[in-house]
Amino acid sequence: MNIKMIAMAVGAAAVLAGCGTVGSDFKAPAGMQEQAFRHAPQGAASEAQLPAQWWTVFSDDTLNRLEHQALRDSPTVKAAAQRLFQAEAQLGLAKASQLPSLTLSTGVSNSRTSANTSQGIALGHRSIHGNNYSVAAGFSYELDLFGRVRRAVESADAQALAASHDRDGVLLLLSSQIATTYWQLRGLDAEMAILRGALATRKETEELVNARFNAGLSNELDTSRARIERANAEADLEEVQRQRNTLEHALAVLVGASPSSMQLEPATATDLPAPPAIPAGVPANLLAHRPDLAASVATLRATNANVGVAEGAFYPSVSLTGNFGYASESLSDISKGGSRVFSFGPLALSLPIFDGGRNQSNLTVAKARYEEAVANHEGKLLTALREVEDALSDVQQRTQQGKVQATSREAATRAYDVARARYERGISTYLDVTDAQRSALAADRAAVQINTQRMLATVSFARALGGGWQAP
């Protein structure tokens, strides 16, 4: 009868455990409204898609190889994966609290009682001695009547989800850093190609000036200027090579390789490929795909659940323990029915009465942390909007700047051709040639630098939207 009553009590408690949960259920913050960005290309919502491996839109095999190498070998990626494993393990610990704890114990002992104690005297001054063998299983279980443990599991689950998004954020940051560094390096390759061409031209010009000087058609000042221009071109080429070496070393570290092992073949083109077009009608609600915002929402959910955990401290805690096993003086008799031992209970209830305000303070802290997380999320959302607008503005303005610079580049090239032709015919001085050379070289390099910035702005746009996205 007692066993039946205990079983009924346990069953009733289990039913009650699913009836209520402390704290309030989490409600995700309102998403972004359907609105277009100020600097986005105008037009209807585009069906164009940026793949999860967003860097493939540049159609550059070397960049693709570097990105995949980084995902495989980068220590940053490995560290982020380990942080995720830790969060998932913490979730496992929290879920374990929802289940009974089972233990198995065995024991053997030899004992002898005194013959001169009251017990021994009652037995006629005899002692009791012998062996004792035992094997038993024990269990303990906290009945989650008010949902405190469920809220703790919810918090751990949200923290694991946040860690997953944080890992995605690390991957996004790393991939964007690689793309940025790579296109900076390719921009320097284009500048080096321009400088090599300029150096060859200056050598030809120096030979022309020397020939005119030897023929008495020029003066020593012109030959000195020619040597200066050639030397300046050589110095500029060495400086750009130095910058390229630095970027190459940085790329090696980003992909998880030794700086000395990275040797990218220089590109020979004097310009960069055109950046991929930004689709028109990019809606702001795509920001929900950003890993930092997704992690922020998961953190909100975790802190909201922690409020429920803190509230649960005000409610009773109910736990049940018990054991079942066998004990015998003889090992051969331990499996017999008469050797069976068991106990159920106590069904223990613990209710906080006075704690000096500890539980109330913990609840206040939990609520404040939730409100802090809400404010942080709002700040991150505004930052995300700004980053997208900045990237779109950069793309737009760099495109316009490139068009204007193309006109300047064409005019500077024409001015140099005219100045050299006039000098060869003796109509103008060599000073006009050097001025035109400098202007043409500066215009060529400026055009490459603007195109490099256009590529970097496209990378920034992809990163600002969270990398992979798909238009609704």
Regions found by a protein language model. Name each.
Residues 73-74, 215, 425:
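Charged, alpha-helical scaffolding/interaction elements associated with membrane systems
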Residues 89, 98, 116-118, 208, ...:
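Amphipathic alpha-helical coiled-coil/rod segments that serve as protein-protein coupling scaffolds
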Residues 79-94, 170, 174-197, 201-204, ...:
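Amphipathic alpha-helical coiled-coil segments
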Residues 62, 74, 88-91, 95-98, ...:
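Sec/Tat-exported extracytoplasmic proteins
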Residues 2-11, 16-72, 119-120, 133, ...:
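Terminal intrinsically disordered/low-complexity segments used for targeting and assembly
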Residues 25, 36, 53, 59-66, ...:
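Small/polar-residue-enriched beta-strand and adjacent coil segments characteristic
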Residues 215-315:
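Acidic, glycine-rich loop-and-beta core segments that form the ion-binding/anion-interacting portion
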